[in-house]
Amino acid sequence: MRTPRLFGSRKETFDNFKVYETMLAGRPFKVEMGKMCGLSNASALIRYGETCVMCNVVMSPKPREGVDFFPLNVEYEEKLYAAGRIPGSFMRREGRPGERAILTSRVVDRPMRPLFPKEMRNDVCITMTVMSLDPDCSPEIAGMIGASLVTAVSDIPWNGPIGGVQVGLVDGEIVLNPTQEQRKVSDLALTVAATMDKIVMIEAGANEVDEDTMLTAIKTAHVEIKKIIEFINKIV
């Protein structure tokens, strides 16, 4: 009988396993690479607080024939097990993606799609799977940053990276990536995605917020996004 090999540490098991750490809006942000999904073009496990999102990107080896558009597919998957819950249906199975998952996929798609070459016709699939959920650390933002990171690291042609943050307005103060309690009382729900030089996507809802406050919120978001992009560039 073959004796199983014992490893002294996790890093000895995976030669390419690397961990990168930084802070995002005052909370720890960690990237683990080289351990999962080795057949994808690039893969990373994103940890933001207690939130964990697995991000992967895959490109077909050949362009799709007979199409005049770029076949990009962005999927955000949020299963109930991530929150420690069991589906309430009779079969106890996960259903089709909910409205939140579909909207999150679109929020990630919008800033990333224009940065691919216009003539590109290869199928590209970006998948973000929520493994665990911390209500105070947005899985949408972790997924967006992770999608940007894996695409930038991969051999897929792309003019990124991008970064993204959420902005709230609590008691007149601008808050980056507000917690669950802060989101409940916030007068602003703003999501900003940007490159190092330009804002590429804004999604917002507000309770009569004036233009100056909105502009300040966007500028504050871009300052934080630049830090994220610098972090991604160090990994790339």
Q: Predicted segment positions?
A:
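N-terminal, positively charged regions that mediate nucleic acid binding
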Residues: 2-72
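A generic local secondary-structure boundary/capping motif
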Residues: 19-20, 32-35, 43-44, 61-63, ...
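Catalytic cores of large soluble enzymes that bind and process phosphate-bearing ligands
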Residues: 20-21, 28, 66, 93-104, ...
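Short glycine/serine/threonine-rich phosphate/pyrophosphate-binding segments
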Residues: 39, 138-144, 161
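Glycine-rich, flexible beta-strand/loop modules in the N-terminal catalytic cores of phosphate-handling
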Residues: 40-124, 130-132, 137, 196, ...
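Small-residue-enriched alpha-helical segments and adjacent helix-cap loops
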Residues: 87, 91-93, 103, 107, ...
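Mobile "lid/hinge" segments at catalytic clefts and subdomain interfaces of large enzymes
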Residues: 155-236
